[in-house]
Amino acid sequence: MRRPLLAVDGDSFAHRAYHALPKKAFRRVDGGPGNALEGFTGMLLRLWQGERPRAVLVAWDTLTAPTYRHTAFTGYQAGREFEPELLEQLDLLPDFVSSAGIVCVKAPGYEADDFLGAAATGEEAAGGNVLVATSDRDAFQLASERTTILQPVRGSAPTRIGPAEVRERYGVEPAQVPDFIALRGDPSDKIPGARGVGEKGAANLLGQYGSLEKMLEEGRFEAEAEALKLYRSLATLDRSAPIPDLPDLEPDWEKLAARASEIGLGRLARLLEDAAAAQ
């Protein structure tokens, strides 16, 4: 049986790593912060060791350029700010991870989730299975018989989310997730949602009508129709995002260990050397 493709939301895991490890305890040889570099790489290694995928793709946001979502809705992710020491490491991480031969994707106009959607769609079309590692629940729309979401849990193995788990959590099908977000809203992305509609109400409406489009056709939310269509587009992953070919490839942990040692992350280097020896 063909091993799955592992597609990782780089920004999601880097944020978790940055806030999980103390900045003062992890410094690079040049004095800069190394906690996100160390924590992210450790998370990535554990994912690889636990799942043994055929290849790994790490997707990144482009923080220096707006996406079509920001252009379409000026309130999208409004007020979101990052600490300078996190931004510095987000800038370093793609090149650092690429030292192991891991494919990293990043392009103006796209979010990491868009690349995850494109990777999942392409792998499924080729008859493969996909593991999508992210804490962003927008990605629940990707859950299928072939695509499983790996949601990180601190101090434990990731929670596996398939179609049944999406139904259990939200009462909707994965394909309904963008409509669900449009109706309920998403505080993390500053998507307002429909007035007076919460999580349960959104699920009930989708159970009754099947889709936001059907609701609007039948006259529901007439005053908010255009706004809700916009919110749905914001929540829909762009599965046409450009990704390279992804041949089977095991990470070269030894090369990444050398890179970690070079920048002064000795503990991480030893961890990666052990992983290389066990390959």
Which positions does each model-derived feature cover?
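Noncatalytic, basic helical substrate-engagement surface that gates or grips nucleic-acid strands
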Residues: 2-133, 137, 141-160, 229-244
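Non-catalytic nucleic-acid-binding/docking modules located in mid-to-C-terminal regions
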Residues: 2-3, 52-57, 125, 144-148, ...
